[in-house]
Design a protein with these regions (language model features):
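Sec-dependent N-terminal signal peptides
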Residues: 4-14
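Boundary at the C-terminal end of the N-terminal hydrophobic targeting segment
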Residues: 10, 18-22
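Short, solvent-exposed loop/turn segments enriched in Ser/Thr/Gly
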Residues: 42-48, 97-105
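Short, acidic/polar linear motifs in exposed loop/turn regions
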Residues: 54-57, 96, 112
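Surface-exposed binding patches on compact interaction domains or structured appendages
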Residues: 56-87
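Short, exposed beta-strand-loop hairpins at the edges of beta-sheets
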Residues: 107-115
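C-terminal edge beta-strand
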Residues: 117-125
């Protein structure tokens, strides 16, 4: 009985270790992009976040969630092979928003080693509302 329990334990540990080795992983060039200072009369700014899959399995982005309706993500839903690059384009639209500094977070859900990753877009909108 003892041998059976030990054998099951070692098999479970072995399977866990093998599955942990085959994982996708993000490596972003930048976590935060500052779009600078811009006038409220031109309230739309874009930022492109590039990343590399540094893992050893295909990276699949399941969902990209912006913290505000003024921030729109655009990304490729196809898997990113190990060693390949991908990008996520973020469009900030400050029309009707208060002027001043802003920092918006974007949460990325994936099959990566870290299931949720956050990136940020920030800047300063000047002028009237």
């Amino acid at each position: 009985m003892k041998k059976l329990v030990l054998m099951i334990l070692f098999m479970t540990i072995g399977i866990t270790m093998v599955s942990a080795q085959n994982q996708a992983e993000f490596k972003f060039d930048q976590i935060t992009i500052n779009v600078g200072t811009f006038p409220a009369s031109s309230p739309v700014k874009k930022a492109v976040f590039t990343f590399t899959n540094v893992g050893n399995a295909p990276l699949v982005i399941n969902e990209v969630i912006a913290s505000c309706g003024c921030t729109i993500p655009k990304y490729d839903r196809r898997p990113i092979a190990p060693g390949q690059k991908g990008s996520i384009e973020i469009t900030y639209n400050g029309q009707g928003k208060f002027t001043g500094h802003f920092k918006k977070s974007i949460t990325i859900k994936s099959n990566g080693r870290t299931e949720m990753t956050r990136i940020y877009i920030e800047g300063v909108m000047e002028g009237g509302k």
